[in-house]
């Protein structure tokens, strides 16, 4: 049992298939409690069944199968199925936006996004998004990547800057990178050239943007199956001994 608890959730599932004796050990609460975070956050009402899961393994399955909303429903948490690390997603209401927000639209129809609202921006000459996350909420001794999830409408207004500066800071250390939301890596032809930026139908006619030169180190988004885009803003390591402070994220 001790050996199984030092492996990973997938390894424990494989061990359970070996024999009945292995299954009894691999499915035990003693093993699966090692894969769950030491201090699970509180969840919003109704996120977990009224009847508690019958075992630690069932609780792990629930929290890894789909995200669970935290109190106030501004943030969600999901466990990584392979490692048990906690992954958090912040809603539009949890972000600090400097650009004018036209509305908070309902985005729950036709997709499986856990948050029902998304911020809509119009006439964006300057976009600034900031967020903070308490480090004590995160899994220790784990490297995290930070992503921005968004959609860019085909018809847009005054979105004229080629890229933004993304920054992720923790414990006095900060990493920055250039990020473009107007290109898509699927546009590349596969020979290492930078992808071309899309042609958008603007409010004053069709606007064609030049390609970003290949000499610039620009990070581009990927399109998910649900139609939303995501682009990595940076990464950081949450050390085992660091349980205080916060992670500062900016997109300016």
Model feature map: region roles:
Residues 12-13, 31:
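Secondary-structure boundary/capping residues
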Residues 2, 20-252:
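Plant-skewed but cross-kingdom recognition/interaction modules and surfaces
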Residues 1-12, 21:
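The Skp1-binding helix-loop-helix core of N-terminal F-box domains in SCF E3 ubiquitin ligase adaptors
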């Amino acid at each position: 049992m001790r050996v199984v608890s030092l492996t990973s959730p997938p390894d424990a599932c494989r061990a359970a298939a070996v024999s009945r004796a292995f299954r009894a050990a691999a499915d035990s609460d003693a093993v699966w409690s090692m894969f769950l975070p030491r201090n699970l956050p509180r969840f919003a009402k109704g996120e977990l069944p009224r009847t508690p899961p019958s075992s630690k393994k069932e609780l792990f399955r629930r929290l890894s199968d789909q995200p669970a909303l935290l109190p106030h429903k501004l943030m969600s948490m999901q466990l990584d199925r392979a490692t048990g690390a906690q992954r958090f997603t912040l809603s539009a209401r949890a972000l600090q936006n400097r650009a004018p927000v036209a509305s908070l639209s309902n985005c729950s129809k036709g997709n499986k996004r856990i948050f029902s609202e998304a911020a809509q921006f119009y006439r964006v000459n300057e976009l600034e998004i900031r967020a903070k996350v308490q480090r004590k909420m995160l899994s220790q001794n784990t490297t995290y990547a930070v992503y921005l999830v968004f959609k860019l409408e085909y018809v847009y207004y005054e979105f004229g800057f080629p890229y933004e500066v993304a920054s992720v800071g923790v414990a006095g250390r900060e990493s920055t990178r250039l990020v473009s939301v107007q290109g898509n890596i699927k546009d590349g032809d596969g020979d290492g050239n930078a992808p071309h930026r899309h042609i958008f139908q603007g409010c004053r006619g069709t606007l064609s943007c030049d390609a970003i030169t290949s000499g610039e180190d620009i990070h581009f988004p990927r399109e998910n199956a649900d139609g939303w885009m995501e682009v990595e803003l940076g990464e950081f390591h949450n050390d085992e001994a660091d349980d205080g402070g916060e992670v500062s994220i900016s997109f300016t």
